[in-house]
Amino acid sequence: MVPEAWRSGLVSTGRVVGVLLLLGALNKASTVIHYEIPEEREKGFAVGNVVANLGLDLGSLSARRFRVVSGASRRFFEVNRETGEMFVNDRLDREELCGTLPSCTVTLELVVENPLELFSVEVVIQDINDNNPAFPTQEMKLEISEAVAPGTRFPLESAHDPDVGSNSLQTYELSRNEYFALRVQTREDSTKYAELVLERALDREREPSLQLVLTALDGGTPALSASLPIHIKVLDANDNAPVFNQSLYRARVLEDAPSGTRVVQVLATDLDEGPNGEIIYSFGSHNRAGVRQLFALDLVTGMLTIKGRLDFEDTKLHEIYIQAKDKGANPEGAHCKVLVEVVDVNDNAPEITVTSVYSPVPEDAPLGTVIALLSVTDLDAGENGLVTCEVPPGLPFSLTSSLKNYFTLKTSADLDRETVPEYNLSITARDAGTPSLSALTIVRVQVSDINDNPPQSSQSSYDVYIEENNLPGAPILNLSVWDPDAPQNARLSFFLLEQGAETGLVGRYFTINRDNGIVSSLVPLDYEDRREFELTAHISDGGTPVLATNISVNIFVTDRNDNAPQVLYPRPGGSSVEMLPRGTSAGHLVSRVVGWDADAGHNAWLSYSLLGSPNQSLFAIGLHTGQISTARPVQDTDSPRQTLTVLIKDNGEPSLSTTATLTVSVTEDSPEARAEFPSGSAPREQKKNLTFYLLLSLILVSVGFVVTVFGVIIFKVYKWKQSRDLYRAPVSSLYRTPGPSLHADAVRGGLMSPHLYHQVYLTTDSRRSDPLLKKPGAASPLASRQNTLRSCDPVFYRQVLGAESAPPGQQAPPNTDWRFSQAQRPGTSGSQNGDDTGTWPNNQFDTEMLQAMILASASEAADGSSTLGGGAGTMGLSARYGPQFTLQHVPDYRQNVYIPGSNATLTNAAGKRDGKAPAGGNGNKKKSGKKEKK
């Protein structure tokens, strides 16, 4: 039954020899599994459950990318990923795969990832008896002389069986006869061949020919056979046969030896003479197939030469049988054996196969990350087959040997996509032969990006200068920012943030394009309103996590000449009359026109000129000071009423201008002359009303202050009683500074901004208790001009200066209730003539001092009861403002009024230029400070 089962090929899968050897079980990366399977199994034949044998999780095969890797062009095996069974995928013919090799093994690799593991599976293909022995010829003819002595051996044709092992050729059988016997011999490669042995002398006359049958049998079950008819012709005697000088010859030859290379020369001799002694050499009948294609034999000389191309990897040793025959009528032959050893040369370059590539690789991949798996083979032997692999130096990769002929490509240093986004690795495999042969393959490794770079800019801050009255929506800045990461991580978003506690600047004044970083203004900017903006550009990328960069953006508004000069004195719309006695000499200071400009720099520099008067030769005006003086003595013929129109121009481009009108009355300095101008009584009545309201306000504020103080004291006492161990009640002290001045502080709520602080100074020699305004808490009178009188509430301005008064920029009616004496004329010394050709101030500080001085003069000029000749140290101001009036009391017109032409600087008693009050005013200053503290 067993032979019949093998013959029908119905061997069940349960009878497969499943020899499983787990070699190196402690090292999973080097596990080798062995299976044995007969050849010629049908497609789908189950070999074994390789997944279970490897200890792998069947459910994770797809996730780990389980696959079969085979270097052959045909894939003989596959693995069912659902069951884990390995099955036959293609026809297995052992003779086709391995020829006559004693062992036939098909090797394949199984690869799984996450983590990357490699398993080797060796399937031994078992031979079955599927091939009959075969003779190279259909029949064999022998000519044997009757003189041949018994015991002579005659080689017979050898049969060839492709099967191996027990299924190969095992023996020969000879048909029954009375002359010959059969002797079966074994070669060095364990193959069998037969020899015909003469046991009884032949008698040609009795039997001139013989018919024998040679049968070749293999060892299979059932045994297969082949028959060869042998025709023997009995010849007449040639009693001497050739003899070789040695029965075995050995030779060594390089596998790359060219055709025609001599291998060995055999030599045989025959004692006969004549044709019976002439020897002819030929290949014996026992040679294996292919010998005649590789070697050539000279029939006369017996020289064995190379005919074809030898291959050490195919056959390492060739066994050649040579026979020698004479030329006699009945030639007898002699035989010898030649063993040709093929010497290996390094004629095969290594072969590289990339079995798995992990790409792209994240640039933050840790050291030792597996990138690719490579298999390297070399068909040469010995040192010629020893292969090493290498990558070019200087790259962040290395090769390590994991299994025999397998190399793992790993990372050996940190990767940076921004530096090198892609590598084309030239992997070289080199053997140890001489000369060394090599192979080259390219492995492409892409580096994937991670968000490891924040947005970058060429500069950390930007200073932008933009002219006021700009066009809304026009770009003012394009931020130059980039991100070296990949496009997704480098997608930038721009935002504007505000610096400090001030809010609302971004949505009110500026905006930024979120995609391209272009900053634009939303509204026209006003230099006089705000000169500087401090913003922060926040740039974030599109990566995860988000990286960001902040850039400071400082926007400076530059001035344009968009404000015409304004007249401070004489007040616009008012009736300003200056008295000029007849007989006044030339150079007498008549009055001073005071103007200011809301612009800055050159745009605020003012110049004065007379447009017209009844007598052009009588008056002259300082170009830069605005001082009007007599150009010649006043004569009796001069008109008693002179109307002067002063043109005030700034220094901008284009220049803007305004005019001021001043009336000069030439009088005899008598009461009748003064009565000609009755309009001066109105300001006095206004001043009476103003004084009344100021006193009433002062009383109300004082009462409120006292009530507040008492309330605070009562509250403190109450708290002290509750926790007398922890708190001490403060004692409030009121100080009254002695002196001629009555000083009261008042905070005017509701009419002005809360940050403005106003002080009212009442002096004992003031007839109408004229008020002055100051900016509170300023260390210098030259602070920002954004809080000057031009921003005051007009109602409050009229309440302080009188019902007919107007804030700067509005002209008030003239005040005729006073007259200037020579000592009371406006001027830096009270009596000196103005310098019409004076130079511009030397520096900004001098300019600011002069502006403050002229504004103070303008305030006195607006008051008909004041004088302008205050003496030294007061810059021409009234004596009543001497101790108290410092630069602290002047509204901040430091950049709005520029009247050059004088090099004089304002100094205090100590000669300093910081605008501090002199020693005589310390009492009032301390009193004011205490009230501010409260």
UniProtKB/Swiss-Prot annotation:
One GO cellular component term noted in the UniProt record for this chain: membrane
Location of the Cadherin domain: 32-135, 136-244, 245-352, 353-457, 458-567, 572-685
Chain intervals for the UniProt region annotation (Disordered): 804-843, 904-934
Annotated glycan sites: N245, N424, N478, N550, N615, N689
Keywords linked to the UniProt accession: Calcium, Cell adhesion, Cell membrane, Glycoprotein, Membrane, Repeat, Signal, Transmembrane, Transmembrane helix
SMART domains reported in the protein's UniProt record: CA (SM00112)
Pfam families: Cadherin, Cadherin_2, Cadherin_C_2, Cadherin_tail
Regions crossing the membrane: 694-714
Molecular function (Gene Ontology), one example: calcium ion binding
Localization per Swiss-Prot or TrEMBL: Cell membrane
Segments of skewed composition (Basic residues): 924-934
Keyword Repeat found: yes
One biological process term in Gene Ontology: calcium-dependent cell-cell adhesion via plasma membrane cell adhesion molecules
PROSITE patterns with a match to the protein in the record: CADHERIN_1 (PS00232), CADHERIN_2 (PS50268)
CDD domains given in the database record: Cadherin_repeat
SUPFAM superfamilies documented for this protein: Cadherin-like
Record's signal peptide: 1-31
Residues on Extracellular side: 32-693
Primary localisation category: membrane
Its membrane topology: Single-pass type I membrane protein
Known function: Potential calcium-dependent cell-adhesion protein. May be involved in the establishment and maintenance of specific neuronal connections in the brain.
Protein name: Protocadherin gamma-C3
